[in-house]
Swiss-Prot record:
PANTHER family: UNDECAPRENYL-DIPHOSPHATASE. Catalyzes the dephosphorylation of undecaprenyl diphosphate (UPP). Confers resistance to bacitracin. One of its GO terms (molecular function) is undecaprenyl-diphosphatase activity. One of its GO terms (cellular component) is plasma membrane. One of its GO terms (biological process) is peptidoglycan biosynthetic process. It is found in: Cell inner membrane. This is Undecaprenyl-diphosphatase. Pfam families: BacA. Bacitracin is thought to be involved in the inhibition of peptidoglycan synthesis by sequestering undecaprenyl diphosphate, thereby reducing the pool of lipid carrier available. It comes from Xylella fastidiosa (strain 9a5c). The chain crosses the membrane at residues 38-58, 75-95, 106-126, 136-156, 181-201, 217-237, 241-261. Keywords: Antibiotic resistance, Cell inner membrane, Cell membrane, Cell shape, Cell wall biogenesis/degradation, Hydrolase, Membrane, Peptidoglycan synthesis, Transmembrane, Transmembrane helix. It is a multi-pass membrane protein. Its EC number is 3.6.1.27.
């Protein structure tokens, strides 16, 4: 029963942190440090739950882009989404081939949380002095693609933080526009990464000993929580900055470093 409860808690944690600029991978690694580590498949599945949630949130936007390619603005936007995704895919595969491993200790995650928090504060400070723009440029698309790889390589960085705030610094200063592009790029990116990882685990026969009840509970928890969090966040950023998330990251990082010493 305790294992089922921890699976539920990890699913909720994934749903809360996946799309907030606080790093879901970092939080999961921290939680598993105390609750016990889970299989790669478990972590992949709960991330898939969060991805499904954001796909549902943006279903109308995705449909309008897919069915409106006769409009230049839609074609241009889709091409930039595709460019960001392809950059992530190519560079990400190269990193995977190099056998990059996630850290097994908390210290690098703590530092990534602190540095990421400072990064958010800098981006917010710079962006508020820029004219409000919501058009995605090619430089933003390329940078977002690379930022996704950085976030995957360094847990604690946060995919949403690295992509949203880099986009803001490069001129996409309207928070909602930067967040939308980040989230839409994240859909194919995370679906592809999850599918590839699942296929690799299947080939190695590592799916035979999973506790499917725990996996299912965590998946549903991540999906429902993720849906609620994204809906809340999209409303929140219309009139608020991301600064509170920055302070949270810095505080958590400092607490972890203090605990480690």
């Amino acid at each position: 029963m305790f294992e089922l409860f921890t699976a539920l808690m990890l699913g909720i944690l994934e749903g809360i942190t996946e799309f907030l600029p606080v790093s879901s991978t970092g939080h999961l690694l921290i939680a598993e440090h105390w609750l016990g580590s889970r299989s790669d498949f478990f972590n992949i599945v709960i991330q898939a739950g969060a991805i499904l949630a954001i796909t549902f949130v943006f279903r109308k936007r995705v449909w309008s882009l897919a069915t409106g390619l006769d409009k230049y603005s839609n074609r241009d936007y889709v091409m930039k989404l595709a460019t960001a995704f392809l950059i992530t895919a190519v560079v990400g595969l190269a990193v995977r081939k190099a056998n990059w491993q996630l850290p097994e200790t908390i210290q690098p995650i703590a530092w990534a949380l602190i540095i990421g928090g400072i990064w958010i504060l800098i981006a917010e400070s710079v962006a508020k002095h820029l004219p409000e723009r919501e058009n995605v440029t090619w430089s933003v698309a390329i940078a977002v693609g690379l930022a996704q790889v950085v976030a995957g390589v360094f847990p604690g960085t946060s995919r949403s933080a690295s992509t949203i705030f880099l986009a803001m610094l490069l001129g996409l200063s309207k928070r909602s526009a930067a967040a939308e592009f980040s989230f839409l790029v994240g859909i194919p990116t995370m679906f592809s990464a999850s599918s590839y990882a699942c296929f690799e685990l299947f080939k190695r026969g590592e799916l035979l000993h999973e506790n499917w009840l725990e996996v299912s509970v965590a998946f549903v928890a991540a999906m429902l929580t993720g849906f609620a969090v994204v809906k809340w966040l999209l409303g929140y950023i219309k009139n608020h900055s991301f600064a509170p998330f920055a302070y949270y990251r810095i505080a958590l990082g400092l607490v972890l470093l203090t605990w480690l010493t």
